[in-house]
Design a protein with these regions (language model features):
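Short alpha-helical donor nucleotide-sugar binding micro-motif in glycosyltransferases
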Residues: 42-43, 50-55
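Aromatic "clamp/platform" in nucleotide-sugar-dependent glycosyltransferases that forms part
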Residues: 63
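Short hydrophobic beta-strand element within catalytic cores of glycosyltransferases
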Residues: 80-83, 93
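A charged, aromatic-enriched C-terminal amphipathic alpha-helix characteristic of glycosyltransferases
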Residues: 125-152
């Protein structure tokens, strides 16, 4: 519904591609009926890489996913990211340089950030910076997060 509202306020050509499956897909498909929203289902490998390559920006609207590996994937694919200032995104996204962080839970601010995305040329420059930043990170941080979660679940103190 928010995307449809954004389209009304935007003069630029927009297209939303939703990758993945989940319990809300049927409901979202019904809401988007007749619009230009594309639902790809779950993708991996080359198919997923093609979707990233065709995008100008990546919007990560989750307020519950803590690891956010898709944020890393998008940035590694050269996309600036719009996300909430929460969990993994806040660690990787540099405000106005590699993407934008909206205050956690403030949906109106998040939507306004999307409406105000800059032109494609600026997005490409930001995506290049995002890719460069993420190349230096590697997978150490998400692996460490996962390790900490396992230790926490097992109620064992993690090694430093």
């Amino acid at each position: 519904q928010s995307y449809l509202n954004i389209k009304k306020e935007q003069s630029r050509k927009l297209k939303m591609v939703i990758v993945g499956d989940g319990p809300d897909r049927k409901r979202l498909t019904e809401i988007a009926n007749g619009s230009d929203v594309i639902f790809t289902g779950s993708l991996t490998g080359q198919s997923l890489a093609q979707v990233y390559a065709s995008a100008d920006a990546f919007v990560f609207a989750s307020q519950i996913e803590t690891f956010g590996n898709v944020v890393l994937e998008a940035m590694a694919s050269g996309l600036p990211v719009v996300a909430y200032n929460y969990a993994s995104p806040q660690r990787y996204i540099k405000q106005g340089i590699t993407g934008w962080l909206s205050p956690f839970g403030q949906v109106a601010h998040f939507m306004q950030t999307i409406i105000q995305l800059p032109e494609q040329k600026v997005l490409r420059c930001m995506g290049t910076q995002a890719r460069q930043d993420i190349e230096s990170v590697g997978w150490q941080y998400p692996v460490k997060q996962f390790e900490q979660a396992l230790y926490h679940a097992a109620n064992i103190k993690a090694a430093p």
